[in-house]
Amino acid sequence: MGEAVKDGREEVIQAWYMDDSEEDQRLPHHKDPKEFVSLDKLAELGVLSWRLDADNYETDEDLKKIRESRGYSYMDFCEVCPEKLPNYEVKVKSFFEEHLHTDEEIRYCVAGTGYFDVRDRNEAWIRVLVKKGGMIVLPAGIYHRFTVDSDNYIKAMRLFVGEPVWTPYNRPHDHLPARKEYVDNFMINASA
């Protein structure tokens, strides 16, 4: 009997269904009992994930291949912490408003930790923990929100196809073509 091969992504990306608590958004918010969500289930919702070498992102061949194959031509960094982000508390609260984008949201955590919350097909929140070395892609049109954890720090590489566009459309924006396409591709057709 062989051991099951462990997916290295699970060391830097984990997901679970959230409780309904109104406590601090930076807490894990596990249900009781805990209800974990597989990375395969996230992929069914269009959320892609990788484990990369965050200590060597400048020379990481895996990152280079991903960028080339997906057309990510622009890159910058965003540090979310009280010392680096003006109006920190206001910004963190705004990131936590449920919203969507008309383009993919690509985030590669090179330091710290963050939570990306996404909706499943039944509108339940799934919390996605991304640690150093984890990279996720949220598809265009998915409703989501973001927060740091209780350490109040993440440094993330932001990747874009072409010039950076980061326009949040707070819910509801179901009329946008990106939302309709997301629903068709991941909510309706996938559940049929």
Curated annotation (Swiss-Prot):
Keywords in alphabetical order: Amino-acid biosynthesis, Cytoplasm, Dioxygenase, Iron, Metal-binding, Methionine biosynthesis, Nickel, Nucleus, Oxidoreductase
Residues reported to bind Ni(2+): H99, H101, E105, H144
Pathway of action: Amino-acid biosynthesis; L-methionine biosynthesis via salvage pathway; L-methionine from S-methyl-5-thio-alpha-D-ribose 1-phosphate: step 5/6
Enzyme class, UniProt record, top EC level: oxidoreductase
Any Pfam family matching the protein: ARD
Gene Ontology molecular function: acireductone dioxygenase (Ni2+-requiring) activity; acireductone dioxygenase [iron(II)-requiring] activity; iron ion binding; nickel cation binding
Any coiled-coil regions, as ranges: none
Catalytic activity, as annotated: 1,2-dihydroxy-5-(methylsulfanyl)pent-1-en-3-one + O2 = 4-methylsulfanyl-2-oxobutanoate + formate + 2 H(+); 1,2-dihydroxy-5-(methylsulfanyl)pent-1-en-3-one + O2 = 3-(methylsulfanyl)propanoate + CO + formate + 2 H(+)
Enzyme nomenclature, EC number: 1.13.11.54, 1.13.11.53
Cofactor binding, note field: Binds either 1 Fe or Ni cation per monomer. Iron-binding promotes an acireductone dioxygenase reaction producing 2-keto-4-methylthiobutyrate, while nickel-binding promotes an acireductone dioxygenase reaction producing 3-(methylsulfanyl)propanoate.
GO BP, sorted A to Z: L-methionine salvage from methylthioadenosine; regulation of cell division
Locations listed in the record: Cytoplasm; Nucleus
Protein origin, superkingdom: Eukaryota
Cofactor: Fe(2+); Ni(2+)
PANTHER family according to UniProt: ACIREDUCTONE DIOXYGENASE
Family, similarity comment: Belongs to the acireductone dioxygenase (ARD) family.
Protein name per UniProt: Acireductone dioxygenase 2
Native species: Arabidopsis thaliana (Mouse-ear cress)
Lineage: Eukaryota, Viridiplantae, Streptophyta, Embryophyta, Tracheophyta
